[in-house]
Amino acid sequence: MESLAALYKNHIVTLQERTRDALARFKLDALLIHSGELINVFLDDHPYPFKVNPQFKAWVPVTQVPNCWLLVDGVNKPKLWFYLPVDYWHNVEPLPTSFWTEEVEVIALPKADGIGSQLPAARGNIGYIGPVPERALQLDIAASNINPKGVIDYLHYYRAYKTDYELACMREAQKTAVNGHRAAEEAFRSGMSEFDINLAYLTATGHRDTDVPYSNIVALNEHASVLHYTKLDHRAPSEMRSFLLDAGAEYNGYAADLTRTWAANNDTDYAQLIKDVNDEQLALIATMKAGVSYVDYHIQFHQRIAKLLRKHQIVTDISEEAMVENNLTGPFMPHGIGHQLGLQVHDVAGFMQDDTGTHLAAPSKYPYLRCTRVLQPRMVLTIEPGIYFIESLLAPWREGQFSKHFNWQKIEALKPFGGIRIEDNVVIHENGVENMTRDLKLA
């Protein structure tokens, strides 16, 4: 494989091309991209954890340093002003020398407010991209050039097409997340609490709670029915029935986002349902290809859910077609089949149909689907179907013409297990699909 340095060099070439096109289209001279600033907790003197501007880390793998600035014009070597204060209270990152620094001009910035003296005097045609508009105004950036929608839409649209460097980083993030999932399963099998399972995951991945790309979902038993459960009980339940883990990792600012579900006892209907969801997920991935709308795969999985609901006699005496048509599958899988993945977990521009930002909303029947794009090579997506037993979603079906088709006794027996979700991260290629997660032998 090419070195990361060689891949990064080509990555910068691609970003420069996109920048040139965006600047020409919107009649700007350059973009000033701000890493962000620390924000103090209200009425306190310590900051919230720092989260870098995604458009900043698209250029450089600097994710932990506030008050940094990039100036890019699509022609000249990108300039990075790297915040390097004299500070004995806090850790100060040294000026970077790494695989990427040959491609960027790195300049020390000793004072956070010193950037003004470093920038070109004429700034009327510079666009600011960052989270602190008032800082841009202080630098005499025109208000109309602060986070200009057209520029951001353009950059967001093309972020769906990953460079080879980005794919390499995402494969590394997968490796880290897979290590965490293996450690977490072991912790579950040994009877640990959600809190301690989470610690095992973080230890195996070398991440802090603030390093993971999203809050880990570590859900035992009925907690698996809460789609974004993040509480972390300190005590293990008296009876272990099920474990759903939705947890990722980061590498150079790029995310992995994996989910697995395990049964404590493999001789149960629930354990067989996990196996069947897993098999259907793999079968769907095997059909994926460029040129097909992501929405189609979401709808297809509802047909697969219907098949499983019939097979397990959770819904009875109604055809699979009628189940999907009347949305009897909806309460069992209330979320979308997945989303784009990259610098952000729910990566941007999932609804964008072109580089002018044309929006195509999710179908009204499936409002929580996060992507409506036609799949193209270099796109990275999650495929994360699930089946859940959520009373608030099932309750409306307890009355009405379809109630008789729900096997309420079976549903009550499955509710203590919470639910099931299986999630892999896939890359669309010209001639097929790469499953980065299964390539690492994560069952």
UniProtKB/Swiss-Prot annotation:
GO biological-process terms attached to the record: proteolysis
GO molecular function term, any single one: aminopeptidase activity
Keyword Repeat: no
Tagged with keyword ATP-binding: no
Cellular component per GO, a single term: cytosol
Record: residues binding Mn(2+) 2: 246, 257, 423
This protein's UniProt keywords: Dipeptidase, Hydrolase, Manganese, Metal-binding, Metalloprotease, Protease
EC number annotated for this UniProt entry: 3.4.13.9
Family: Belongs to the peptidase M24B family. Bacterial-type prolidase subfamily.
Name of the protein in question: Xaa-Pro dipeptidase
Originating species: Citrobacter koseri (strain ATCC BAA-895 / CDC 4225-83 / SGSC4696)
